[in-house]
């Protein structure tokens, strides 16, 4: 019965969304706007999770996992470590755009000042690639950095400004 009701609900939702003119491209545009709103403040407040599938796959140079619960945990961990280890940290979002029919790309820079007496600065650029399913929800998020994790870690021991 539950499966049958879920199927009816999905069918109803599809017709309802079609009826009000919400199509795939509109959904992608909404996802782009959500990302644009979420990323600049990801070190300060939580992001919106309604644009991701339950089995979202995430990968960056140091992490790889699947599932929305784990995805939530990684963002909580980012905020926790940002408050604990940095006196100042920023996520500068440069651009978010649809790079293919089912792909969204975001370019960004992370920069901050470590909570250490020598006030080490960190700085690295990267881009996020989001893949969307047929419903316009993100099922894969991969981050690519312009430096290896070890190179970023070395910035922690330098005094003052990070080298670009």
For each feature predicted by the language model, list its residue ranges:
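C-terminal and inter-domain tail/linker signature
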Residues: 1-164
């Amino acid at each position: 019965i539950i499966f049958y009701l879920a199927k009816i609900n999905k069918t109803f939702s599809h017709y309802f969304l079609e009826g009000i003119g919400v199509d795939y491209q509109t959904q992608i545009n909404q996802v782009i706007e959500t990302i644009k709103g979420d990323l600049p403040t990801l070190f300060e407040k939580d992001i919106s999770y309604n644009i991701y599938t339950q089995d979202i796959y995430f990968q960056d140079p140091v992490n790889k996992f699947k599932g929305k619960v784990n995805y939530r945990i990684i963002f909580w961990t980012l905020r926790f470590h940002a408050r604990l280890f940095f006196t100042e940290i920023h996520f500068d979002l440069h651009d978010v755009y649809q790079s293919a029919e089912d792909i969204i790309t975001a370019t960004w820079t992370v920069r901050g000042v470590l909570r250490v007496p020598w006030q080490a600065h960190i700085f690295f650029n990267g881009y996020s690639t989001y893949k969307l399913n047929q419903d316009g929800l993100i099922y894969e998020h991969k981050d690519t950095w312009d430096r290896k994790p070890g190179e970023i870690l070395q910035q922690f021991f330098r005094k003052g400004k990070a080298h670009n």
